[in-house]
Regions:
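Nucleotide-sugar donor-binding/catalytic module of glycosyltransferases
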Residues: 1-173
Length: 173
């Protein structure tokens, strides 16, 4: 079974965080590790994270401190700190709720790609604060290809799962 390292950056996300953590724990693909970087939250985010880590097997959840420079710097810091050893890499946001098959579907799609540098992404079911569906994320307006990815967001970051080779390349960048 392929291990997936999930990276999550948090900051004052306590009001939504438990639902995302529960959705990670409920994944049908159970071979995952979670690394969370909290960027100086002043709400209950640290307590929610500590409780989740305490309820999981030892070593499955790692908590680190963010750099204190915003969401993008927090994710970059996570990528640099990740201890990769051949895992696929997935990203999530603190206010996501993953479908139980999210990791399994992504890994199945990656397994069907011959190129070792592979990236999976999906559309997002957009919900309101009560988790009531309000629509799907828009489809890209241009064909999916590298050239268009340079000028258009073709894969939402919070749906990305990348192959081990792609994860290593990202970390080395």
């Amino acid at each position: 079974m392929t291990t997936v390292l999930i990276l999550m950056a948090t900051h004052n996300g306590g009001s939504f965080l438990a639902e995302q953590l529960d959705s990670i724990a409920a994944q049908s693909h159970a071979d995952w590790r979670l690394m969370v970087s909290d960027d100086a939250s002043s709400d209950n985010t640290p307590a929610v994270l500590q409780a989740f880590r305490a309820a999981r097997p030892t070593g499955q959840v790692a908590l680190v401190s963010g750099p204190g420079r915003g969401a993008a710097a927090n994710f970059r810091s996570l990528i640099r700190q990740a201890r990769l050893s051949g895992e696929c890499l997935a990203f999530c946001d603190q206010d996501d709720v993953w479908h139980p098959e999210h990791l399994a579907r992504g890994l199945e799609a990656l397994a069907g790609i011959a190129n070792p540098l592979a990236l999976y992404g999906s559309r997002v079911q957009v919900c309101d604060a009560g988790l009531n569906p309000v629509g799907l994320s828009p489809l890209p307006s241009r064909p999916l290809c590298f050239r268009n990815a340079l000028v258009q967001n073709v894969i939402s970051g919070n749906t990305q799962i990348m192959s081990p080779a792609a994860a290593a390349l990202l970390q080395a960048a």
